[in-house]
């Protein structure tokens, strides 16, 4: 599935993918890639969408996240979904990897389940390695075994991870200038076993994770 903008509060359920998913040509902004769905339009706080009981066994690869001229925009990718949703009972077995050219997006997020989380996740499993190997100059990079970047309060319950989480991406242009929106995290690379980066001042609960 590509970008789903069909409404709010819908469910993607019981889907399975065994084919590789590759992004070889990208735009300067809003690059989204996932084993089940690229983008589930799930960033609304009150009426999020749900991805439930889905399984991905195909490798997810972004080989050219953005063009060399790009300095702004977003790139999000995950074994299940690029963007966020409510995640229930999803499993990823495929390797999730970003590599290749360009200065990169101002925000680059990669996770074993999703590049972004803003709602609860229950019963999710990731067994695919998460590799952020673009090797070039992005500004904000978030690499997580389950989720790349958390932006709203959430709870992770009964989730599991058995995979390598590696980030070798460099972030080193205009780093001394900072930004008005996020001066503390300008020129930062974050990697975490569960979540790559958690936005400040949000409530996070982790229960029964192994």
Report the location of each language-model feature.
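Surface-exposed loop/turn motifs in large extracellular/passenger domains
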Residues: 1-210
């Amino acid at each position: 599935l590509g970008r789903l903008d069909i409404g709010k509060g819908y469910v993607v359920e019981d889907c399975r993918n065994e084919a590789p998913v590759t992004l070889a040509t990208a735009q300067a902004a809003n690059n989204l890639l996932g084993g089940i769905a690229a983008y589930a339009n799930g960033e609304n706080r009150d009426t999020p969408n749900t991805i439930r009981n889905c399984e991905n066994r195909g490798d997810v690869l972004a080989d050219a996240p953005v063009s060399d001229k790009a300095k702004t925009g977003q790139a999000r990718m995950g074994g299940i979904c690029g963007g966020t949703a409510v995640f229930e009972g999803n499993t990823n077995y495929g390797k999730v990897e970003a590599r290749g050219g360009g200065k990169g997006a101002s925000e680059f997020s990669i996770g074993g389940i999703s590049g972004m989380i803003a709602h609860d996740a229950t019963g999710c499993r990731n067994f695919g390695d998460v590799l952020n190997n673009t090797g070039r100059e992005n500004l904000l990079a978030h690499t997580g075994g389950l989720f790349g970047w958390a932006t709203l309060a959430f709870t992770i319950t009964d989730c599991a991870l058995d995979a390598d989480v590696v980030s070798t991406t460099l972030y080193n242009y205009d780093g001394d200038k900072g930004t008005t929106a996020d001066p503390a995290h300008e020129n930062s690379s974050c990697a975490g076993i569960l979540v790559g980066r958690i936005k400040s001042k949000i409530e996070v609960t982790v229960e029964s994770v192994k």
